[in-house]
Design a protein with these regions (language model features):
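Short beta-strand segments
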Residues: 9, 63-67, 134-140, 144
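Adenylate-forming
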Residues: 116-122, 143-145, 164
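General beta-strand structural signal in soluble alpha/beta enzymes
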Residues: 107-111, 115
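A short, polar/charged loop-to-alpha-helix boundary motif
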Residues: 157-171
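ATP-binding/phosphotransfer module of carbohydrate and carboxylate kinases, centering on a glycine-rich
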Residues: 1-61, 70-78, 97-107, 119-131, ...
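A charged helix-plus-loop insertion that forms the helical arch/lid used to bind
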Residues: 76-92
């Protein structure tokens, strides 16, 4: 019998649940809105129980790639909990524990962005690399990745969307929308920040709108910081805002300008190599749930070892 794995991409607006082994083998998939914890978790459990019945019990483990903040430390008493999220009703929910107890299966758990990064490392834009980052720019801004073949963990998990970047209030008097920090990266450059600043959602703004030069500048400032601190071999930019493909050439031009020759690496210095350095995700919208399946594979097979 083929060993199968369950994945849950737990998003703030929707859950995606799937069963399979990887991008070329997804046996079943379902999507439903994220409502209350009780209803949402119940629907996830029903999906996997139904698949277990159909497959004769072939699911070995479940992986969860969740919105956050979360506690991803297996040694912590609150491992698998969603912690200080602003989403009403979801604070301190033991998501991993509810799934583990409901299905009696091992559970792997991490942030949604670390999950997407993991999937891109195994099957997508960062395949073959051991140090890279994945930044998603959409309703919020979040980041994850791998350093030396290990997911970025430590005190908690990366909160790349909440770094502080230079904000010239004369050029951009917008105060920012982050309820915690105001004008952090997410407060200035997320999709809702663009809409609040310009009075229209990003998808309604034409490519020549001044919003995009400012957006590229803010994202390039963040990437310059990440390049200097993490030295990634590749940077993957996903999320709804990055569907504006004209942002990529703007960002690729702005990052070397900001670094000003200090980082002597060909992907930074060579315009052609830069095209392969700052890239969109290969797996697209499937990266999150595929990352969850990868977390499940790891939980079932080698929970105490590096994941790549």
């Amino acid at each position: 019998m083929t060993q199968l794995y369950g994945g849950i991409e737990a998003g703030g607006t929707k859950f995606v649940c799937a069963v399979g082994t990887g991008p070329d083998d997804l046996r079943a998939e379902v999507r439903f809105p994220t409502t209350t914890p009780q209803e949402t978790i119940r629907r996830a459990l029903e999906f996997f129980r139904d698949q277990q019945d159909r497959l004769g019990g072939g699911i070995r483990a479940i992986g969860i790639a969740s919105f956050g903040p979360v506690d991803p430390n297996p040694a912590s008493p609150t491992f698998g909990h969603i912690t200080s999220t602003p989403k009403p009703g979801w604070q301190n929910v033991d998501l991993a524990g509810e799934i583990r107890r409901g299905l009696n299966l091992p559970v792997g758990f991490d942030t949604d962005v670390n999950g997407a990064a993991l999937a891109e490392g195994l099957w997508g834009a960062a395949r073959g690399l051991d140090t890279f980052i994945y930044l998603t720019v959409g309703t919020g801004i979040g980041g994850g990745g791998m350093v030396g073949g290990r997911r970025l963990h430590g005190l908690l998990h990366p909160e790349m969307g909440h770094i502080r970047i230079p904000h010239d209030r004369q050029a951009d008097p917008f105060a920012g929308i982050c309820p915690y920090h105001g004008d952090c990266l997410e407060g200035l450059a997320s999709g809702p920040a663009i809409a609040a600043r310009w009075g229209a959602p990003p998808e309604d703004l034409p490519p020549d709108h001044p919003a995009w030069a400012l957006e590229a500048h803010y994202l390039a400032l963040a990437l310059a910081n990440f390049i200097c601190t993490l030295s990634p071999q590749r940077i993957i930019l996903g999320g709804g805002v990055m569907r504006q493909s004209h942002l990529f050439p703007r960002i690729r031009a702005e990052v070397p300008r900001l670094l000003n020759g200090y980082i002597q690496a060909r992907p930074i210095l060579d315009e052609e190599e830069m095209q392969a350095y700052i890239v969109p995700p290969v797996l697209g919208a499937r990266a999150g749930v595929l990352g969850a399946i990868a977390l499940a594979r790891h939980a079932a097979n080698a929970p105490d070892s590096p994941i790549l």
